[in-house]
């Protein structure tokens, strides 16, 4: 039984969640990545901009004065004022950090090279902090990195400068107020110890023997999103932050807060932009910096409209968040998010498979017993019944299927990731050499995770969000009978100042789902024994829409089958729409009529519409418009097919302002190859010209699926994999061993296995989402979401000009050991 404190009253939570009705059934659990903006905030910003005229502050005094007022309001939010701190607007946390290191004076005297100060950073910092070391090296500063445990031990030790030498350099230490990796809160009450030299013993020997002046750079970006930074109680020299982390808006705007008594050490800023000088000669090396400190650092025109929106951001947050804890909205948010994360932690802590194996491996530095040490963040990985890890990419696909937004990977915190995953420096380098890159989907190497799953809560999250997430975990990943659980919600009783209200009891009853035991993820591939035929040809004229099934034969073009994925639907922002965002797309079923030379679009309940196939490029460019979009990071040149079909598609998919785009004939998108290999042209398909599906493997998979709710027959299940070439043979899985394929008179090269995502969980007849077959694919292939093989066209075997591939053609498969199977 989990006993928790409910912070925000149910009625208040209803008002808060109504601000985010646009989420629909999406469960957003990535507040550490970005806070969501409330609806009324955007409305109020819009109204403010429509009724006022804001000009460049270099031109308009009223705008400049308003910005100064907002500067004061932001400082007040952190319980300080302009007499103690100066606020410098930046483009974000990263620029704020960079501004400090670029301007920091490590040597007290420019001629004293021997006593240059040091740059000290915690190994578990965000990448943006670690990157500062490169600039510190350029300034001849000693660079020192400190491990997590060492840092905590040292900074909690009281120190006092005792050396008789007082001419040491200036030292800068950078650490986060809260880890963006797992939400651990680093001590803020130790700043005085740092300034008194508790880190001296980590410097070079000759620097240990002299007194250095220490300055603290606090990365507060993750902390201020859900916690109260009280600069009246703790006073770091420099604080960096981004406003979208707090308010959800605006992006591209941050701040550097500089303690007034530490301004003098930021004296080495070299570049100066518009608005930062009092006098300048362009024909002589002469300029005078602004007298007002923050004006020296805000190069060029400020992002004044974004800054002005901060007034509405503050007003909105103070309006919609009740002041439950210490009469403070940020304290309220802190407690609210902490108890949500603690609830999730408690539920996952006891989650086990049927054989007793723990299903969760946590990566924490606290146990959620102390809110001063932990934020509303939980980081972990999933473990299978046999003790092996489930890759975060596999998890991500399932989360997407359930409309749950989370963050996976290392979260730009290599140090924390390395420490918690127990990876050596050699391990990290070996992973890179094996092909793993930051931000990619390579989640397991040698069965070891390369990253983790991070859940983070905002003030708009509820216990229902926790339930939805836990139910997804139980349904998809835990081989166990879900237990009935009770959660007791108590009213919060920390201090007499807090407003009390009656609690209630909510019962969480998780679904009981039958799960198959995974005995062995090693797949036995049977030997080839019988013939193979091409059973069916399918093309998908419009990317991510329904299939056009061909009964006889079809022409092979330079990019794949003719008319296969030659069109795509784009949103009003130019981004390609797929079934992941709109499952109704599968019910748009194109037909290619070669006699009439048209493509006919069909959709249930709508009159079909046709568009011509053979308009010349000149005609299309005359009547349509040339446009650009992206498919799998590739820029695509396309032709807009006009308003009539655009309106038809928009009505069918119930999304406004959609457009149908046809790939331009002179678009040269190609298959990613090594430099010395011939590049094959690609249509709008994701990764290859053709996708082959073996029906025997589909049948094998169907027999492995044990979910009683999944009722697809063999043909419907095959349709989910959206293959171009559907083959029939007796053996399952053998296609995974092929090197190349000869179908009739045409040779194809195997380009690898097809990676799968939640698209296969969309019923191609109805657009409904299911958990299967992705879950079983992951189970059977050890977490590797691969099904089907990619092919590229080589040419005809007899060197003829024949370009027609016919159904029921015989197939010869060449195995990886060069044996030919028939």
From Swiss-Prot:
Gene3D superfamilies: Aspartate Aminotransferase, domain 1, Type I PLP-dependent aspartate aminotransferase-like (Major domain)
Biological role: Sulfurates the molybdenum cofactor. Sulfation of molybdenum is essential for xanthine dehydrogenase (XDH) and aldehyde oxidase (ADO) enzymes in which molybdenum cofactor is liganded by 1 oxygen and 1 sulfur atom in active form.
Natural source organism: Bombyx mori
Gene: mal
Lineage per the UniProt record: Eukaryota, Metazoa, Ecdysozoa, Arthropoda, Hexapoda
The UniProt record lists the keyword Nucleotide-binding: no
Active-site residues, Swiss-Prot/TrEMBL: 412
The protein's name: Molybdenum cofactor sulfurase
EC number of this enzyme: 2.8.1.9
PROSITE patterns: MOSC
């Amino acid at each position: 039984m989990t006993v928790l404190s409910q912070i925000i009253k149910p009625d208040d939570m209803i008002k808060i969640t109504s601000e985010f009705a646009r989420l629909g059934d999406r469960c957003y659990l990535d507040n550490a990545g970005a806070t969501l903006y409330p609806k009324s905030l955007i409305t109020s910003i819009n109204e403010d901009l429509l009724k006022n005229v804001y000009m460049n502050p270099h031109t308009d005094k009223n705008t400049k004065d308003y910005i100064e007022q907002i500067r004061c309001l932001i400082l007040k939010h952190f319980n300080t004022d302009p007499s103690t701190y100066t606020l410098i607007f930046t483009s974000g946390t990263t620029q704020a950090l960079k501004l400090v290191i670029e301007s920091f004076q490590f040597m007290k005297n420019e001629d004293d090279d021997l006593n240059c100060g040091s740059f000290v950073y915690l190994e578990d910092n965000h990448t943006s902090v670690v990157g500062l070391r490169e600039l510190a090296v350029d300034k001849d500063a000693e660079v020192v990195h400190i491990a997590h445990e060492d840092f905590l031990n040292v900074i909690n030790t009281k120190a006092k400068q005792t050396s008789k030498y007082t001419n040491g350099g200036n030292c800068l230490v950078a650490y986060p107020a809260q880890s963006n990796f797992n939400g651990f809160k680093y001590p803020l009450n130790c700043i005085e110890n740092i300034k008194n030299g508790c880190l001296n013993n980590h410097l070079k020997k000759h620097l240990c023997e002299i007194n250095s002046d220490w300055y603290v750079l606090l990365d507060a970006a993750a902390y201020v999103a859900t916690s109260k930074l009280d600069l009246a109680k703790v006073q770091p020299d420099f604080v960096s932050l981004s406003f979208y982390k707090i308010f959800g808006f605006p992006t591209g705007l941050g701040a550097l807060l500089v303690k007034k008594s530490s301004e003098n050490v930021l004296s080495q800023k070299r570049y100066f932009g518009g608005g930062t000088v009092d006098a300048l000669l362009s024909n002589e090396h002469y300029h005078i910096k602004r007298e007002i400190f923050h004006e020296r650092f805000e190069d060029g025109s400020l992002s004044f409209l974004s800054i002005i929106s901060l007034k509405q951001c503050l007003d909105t947050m103070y309006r919609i968040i009740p002041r439950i804890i210490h009469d403070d909205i940020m304290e309220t948010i802190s407690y609210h998010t902490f108890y949500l994360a603690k609830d999730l932690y408690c539920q996952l802590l006891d989650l086990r498979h049927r054989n007793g194996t723990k299903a969760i491996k946590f990566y924490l530095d606290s146990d959620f017993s102390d809110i001063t040490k932990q934020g509303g963040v939980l980081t972990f990985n999933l473990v299978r019944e046999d003790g092996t890890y489930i890759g975060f990419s596999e998890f991500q696909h399932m989360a997407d299927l359930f409309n749950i937004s989370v963050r996976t990977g290392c979260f730009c915190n290599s140090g924390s990731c390395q420490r918690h995953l127990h990876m050596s420096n050699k391990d990290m380098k070996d992973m890179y050499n094996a092909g793993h890159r930051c931000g990619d989907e390579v989640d397991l190497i040698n069965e070891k995770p390369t990253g983790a799953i991070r859940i983070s809560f905002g003030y708009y999250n509820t216990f229902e969000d926790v339930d939805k997430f836990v139910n997804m975990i139980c349904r998809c990943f835990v081989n166990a009978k879900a237990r009935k659980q009770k959660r007791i919600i108590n009213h919060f009783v920390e201090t007499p100042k807090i407003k009390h209200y009656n609690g209630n009891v909510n019962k969480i009853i998780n679904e009981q789902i039958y799960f198959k035991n995974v005995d062995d993820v090693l797949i036995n591939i049977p030997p080839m024994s019988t013939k193979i035929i091409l059973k069916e040809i399918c093309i998908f004229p419009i990317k991510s829409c329904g299939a056009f099934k061909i009964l006889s034969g079809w022409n092979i073009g330079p990019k794949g089958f003719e008319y296969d994925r030659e069109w795509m639907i784009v949103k009003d922002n130019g981004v390609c729409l797929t079934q992941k965002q709109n499952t109704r797309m599968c019910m748009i079923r194109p037909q290619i009529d070669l006699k009439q030379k048209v493509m006919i679009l069909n959709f249930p309940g709508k009159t079909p519409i046709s568009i011509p196939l053979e308009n010349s490029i000149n005609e299309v460019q005359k009547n349509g418009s040339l446009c650009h979009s992206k498919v799998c990071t590739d820029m695509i040149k396309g032709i807009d097919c006009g308003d009539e079909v655009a309106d038809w598609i928009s009505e069918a998919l119930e999304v406004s302002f959609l457009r149908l785009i046809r790939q331009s004939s002179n678009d040269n998108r190609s298959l990613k190859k090594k430099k010395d290999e011939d590049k094959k042209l690609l249509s709008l398909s994701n990764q290859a010209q053709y996708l082959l599906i073996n029906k025997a493997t589909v049948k094998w998979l169907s027999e492995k699926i044990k979910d009683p709710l999944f009722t697809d027959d063999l043909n419907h299940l095959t349709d989910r994999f959206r293959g171009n070439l559907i083959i029939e043979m007796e053996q399952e899985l053998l296609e995974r061993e092929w090197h190349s394929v000869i179908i009739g008179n045409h040779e194809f090269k195997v380009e690898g296995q097809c990676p799968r995502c939640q698209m296969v969980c969309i019923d191609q007849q109805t657009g409904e989402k299911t958990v299967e077959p992705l879950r079983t694919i992951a189970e059977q292939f050890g977490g590797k979401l691969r099904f089907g093989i990619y092919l590229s066209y080589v040419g005809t075997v007899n060197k003829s000009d024949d370009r027609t591939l016919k159904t029921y053609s015989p197939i010869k498969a060449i195995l990886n050991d060069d044996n030919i199977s028939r």
